[in-house]
């Protein structure tokens, strides 16, 4: 089961992010899936697509995600990843800078019967803001 769940996670990153196939979101995410991010919770694939995928693909082009490590135990899959992109749209209120951005993150997901039922994402939002030109690191640290 763990290997099949790892395959779901790898497919998620490859198709949803690298190939920009939004149809894969509904295919791999259960209708009642819950997503947890620093900006709140999403409910189901349409909500996740609108609040996460549309926001990121609208703000960044050339998104590429490399999966560096994947660990699975039963229905739990943890993925360590790194992403590169170009800031070409409004991101977190920061106008397009055309700058390259690189972030690291971790995704923890629960996969049941081949579909993602819950997920947690953690990534370097401060680093993203700095790279987009929204603040210098010194400004972020002084707050």
Label every model-predicted segment:
Residues 86-112:
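Exposed beta-sheet edge and beta->alpha loop/turn motif
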